[in-house]
Amino acid sequence: IEKDCNFAIEDEKEMVLIGYLAFLDPPKPSAAEAIEQLYAHGVAVKILSGDNDVVVKAIARQVGIDTSHFLTGIEIENMDETALKEAVKDTTLFSKLTPLQKTQIISLLQEQGNTVGFLGDGINDAGALRQSDIGISVDSAVDIAKESADIILLEKDLMVLEDGVLEGRKTFGNINK
């Protein structure tokens, strides 16, 4: 089959739409329970995504994350540093973010004294994984995400996040004795 990259307006005639193709990336079955347990242990959960706001809000609702505090990448672009510093404190959902905006948000949270873990699996997550205190990826992630992560989850169950928090706190407590 020859590849022909020369297209003209004339080529776009007598076309008939035969359907749409949609992709769904639903949350893992354990996500809602894992998030509930993280909340119970005092861990704040935020979504930083390049996806659109409709998708991000739908996923957040499914896993039990508050959808009332929401910012888009475009809104962030139009904010000054002071306003953004204040906004990231309470915002739980961020959509249509660029890779640089993800990194910026993590950095601002760290400046406020937070220890930030970031879970990502795509090319656009590499910078955020590096910037975070604990970069977490999954075994099926793209290579650059796995290389940028501190931890790679081998299980498909997000409850290991709770286990990690509890073990980390035990270790920290033992070190400080």
Give, region by region, the residue ranges found by the protein language model.
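Mg2+-dependent phosphoryl-transfer enzymes with acidic/Ser/Thr/Gly-rich catalytic loops
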Residues: 122-177
